[in-house]
């Protein structure tokens, strides 16, 4: 059984539990530095890492897919690379639906496979903290709803590394409405005045398939359930109930039956994400509808130019 992230991680100020775990955060940070290895660099393929500092729910996979779409439009042969995790088959399937995916327990092995297949660009979904690979382009993703939570590193908070490490990064991508991002952008610029900030929000691609007079029950096991529900409400769907499960949750028949029973109580149709739908492969999905979404990037031209220039570099 997979647990949800602790609620105190997303409090705006550290709680008693955060301070209680602070010594472990310090120890974990020291271990990470000690285990750091020389980074692998190569000239045979360009590497882009779409990663995060806040753990989970920042839109990495969606941005990786968007980058692949942009490269495809410009006739640049790109693939995806994702470290293999048995509990993240949903993301692996989603990436595979949108291009060639190389997945291995070691990212460097997957990268060498991509090189042998003649790809020009490798897009890493996650791996920002992988100390073995030197990326040509790194993009740090955040979600406006959670931002950095209580601002502390694991396990005291939700951060994989200190937020001040943004000083060493060149690119940030923010998920959310522009109005909600103003304060976050100001905080980022105070840390690194020269950092490039782009932003975007999720848009549903098949929203016209849904009757807006109908009741809907929403369920998901993704990093940021609230973002998904907010998107549906912004598109005028009548959400009467929503069920949140842990990220990458593997649904049992019992879970599935409970979802069906809850929907019947509200006389509601059932909606989930494409990721969750892919995890229901062994269950009867006839009563489940999924929303296919994409990222609408505020300055796609800027991102496109950056990607083209990257590929042109020797």
UniProtKB/Swiss-Prot annotation:
Mention one GO biological process in which this protein takes part, according to its record.
Answer: lipid A biosynthetic process
Q: Where does ATP bind?
A: 54-61
Pathway named in the protein's UniProt entry: Glycolipid biosynthesis; lipid IV(A) biosynthesis; lipid IV(A) from (3R)-3-hydroxytetradecanoyl-[acyl-carrier-protein] and UDP-N-acetyl-alpha-D-glucosamine: step 6/6
Identify the InterPro entries for this entry: LpxK
Stated EC number for the protein is: 2.7.1.130
Reactions accelerated catalytically: a lipid A disaccharide + ATP = a lipid IVA + ADP + H(+)
* Function description: Transfers the gamma-phosphate of ATP to the 4'-position of a tetraacyldisaccharide 1-phosphate intermediate (termed DS-1-P) to form tetraacyldisaccharide 1,4'-bis-phosphate (lipid IVA).
Regarding protein family, the annotation reads:
Belongs to the LpxK family.
Protein's UniProt name: Tetraacyldisaccharide 4'-kinase
Q: Which organism is it from?
A: Pelagibacter ubique (strain HTCC1062)
- The coding gene here is lpxK
């Amino acid at each position: 059984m997979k647990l949800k992230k602790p609620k105190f991680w997303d409090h705006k100020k550290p709680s008693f539990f955060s301070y209680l775990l602070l010594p472990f955060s310090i120890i974990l940070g020291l271990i990470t530095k000690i285990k750091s290895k020389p980074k692998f660099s190569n000239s045979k393929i360009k590497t882009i890492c779409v990663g995060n500092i806040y753990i989970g729910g920042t839109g990495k996979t969606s941005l990786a897919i968007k980058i692949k779409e942009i490269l495809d439009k410009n006739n640049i042969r790109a693939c995806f690379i994702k470290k293999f995790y048995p509990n993240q088959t949903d993301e692996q399937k989603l990436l595979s639906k949108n291009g060639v995916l190389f997945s291995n327990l070691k990212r460097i092995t997957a990268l060498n496979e991509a090189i042998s297949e003649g790809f020009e660009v490798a897009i890493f979904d996650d791996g920002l903290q992988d100390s073995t690979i030197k990326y040509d382009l790194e993009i740090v993703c955040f979600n406006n709803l959670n931002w950095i939570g209580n601002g502390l590193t694991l396990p005291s908070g939700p951060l994989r590394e200190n937020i001040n490490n943004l000083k060493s990064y060149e690119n940030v991508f923010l998920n959310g409405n522009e109005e909600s991002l103003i304060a976050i952008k100001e905080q980022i610029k105070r840390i690194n005045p020269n950092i490039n900030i782009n932003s975007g929000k999720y848009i549903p691609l098949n929203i016209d398939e849904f009757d807006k007079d109908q009741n809907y029950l929403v369920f998901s096991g993704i990093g940021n359930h609230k973002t998904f529900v907010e998107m549906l409400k912004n598109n005028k769907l009548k959400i009467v109930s929503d069920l949140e499960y842990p990220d990458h949750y593997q649904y049992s028949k019992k879970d599935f039956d409970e979802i069906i029973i809850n929907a019947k109580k509200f006389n509601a149709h059932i909606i989930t994400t494409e990721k969750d739908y892919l995890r229901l492969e062994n269950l009867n999905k006839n009563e489940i509808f999924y929303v296919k979404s994409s990222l609408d990037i505020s300055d796609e031209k800027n991102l496109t130019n950056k990607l083209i220039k990257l590929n042109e570099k020797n």
